A protein has these predicted regions:
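Non-catalytic, surface beta->alpha helical segment in thiol-disulfide oxidoreductase systems
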Residues: 110, 115-144
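Short Cys/His-rich micro-motifs in 6-15 aa windows
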Residues: 32-41
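Typically the conserved alpha-helix immediately C-terminal to a functionally engaged Cys/Sec
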Residues: 72-85
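Cys/His-rich microdomains that often coordinate metals
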Residues: 13-16, 35-36, 75
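Short linker/helix segments within small regulatory modules
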Residues: 18-27
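Short pre-active-site segment immediately N-terminal to redox-active cysteine/selenocysteine motifs
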Residues: 57, 64-67, 110
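A short beta-strand-turn-helix
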Residues: 41-59
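Short cysteine-rich clusters marking metal-coordination/redox-active sites
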Residues: 9-12, 29-32
Length: 144
């Protein structure tokens, strides 16, 4: 048996200890009873950021804006990736307009931008919209 993974709840930010062998069992948050692992992206906000990047599973953040055409065309690709990566990587969307302070803190210069976090630290960044095979290849190159 391996050490449990620490995974923040996307709904309440509560930190959950989940054994690796139970990741496929759709674990629920001990605090709010919401699903801890989703097969779709969750919304990341300024107040959630510090808690959400700390988890043991990687977190891929799509920084986007409603007025951005490439962001809108990339949204379905990101949704498909979330479904394929459930239990391996968590995916979140950060609205750069609604979270301008966090976007500035992250040094966002263009959108869409993807930022990969692992154990509380940024490990990779990619700008632009691209097809699902290219996104998955980039994530594989990052060890996901």
């Amino acid at each position: 048996m391996t050490d449990p993974l620490l995974i923040p709840c996307p709904a309440c930010n509560g930190l959950n200890r989940i054994p690796a062998e139970r990741l496929a069992d759709q674990p629920k948050c001990g605090r709010c009873k919401s699903a801890v692992l989703l097969d779709k992206p969750f919304e990341l906000k300024q107040g959630d950021y510090a808690s959400q990047i700390k988890g043991d599973l990687p977190l891929l953040v799509d920084v986007w804006a409603d007025w951005c055409g490439p962001c809108k065309s990339f949204a379905p690709v990101f949704e498909q990736a979330a479904a394929q990566l459930a239990g391996k990587c968590r995916l979140a969307k950060l609205d750069s307009e609604a979270n301008q302070q966090l976007s500035a803190q992250l040094g966002i210069r263009s959108i869409p931008s993807l930022i990969l976090f692992r154990n509380g630290r940024e490990v990779a960044r990619q700008s632009g919209a691209f097809p699902l095979p290219q996104l998955m290849a980039w994530l594989r190159s990052q060890g996901i």
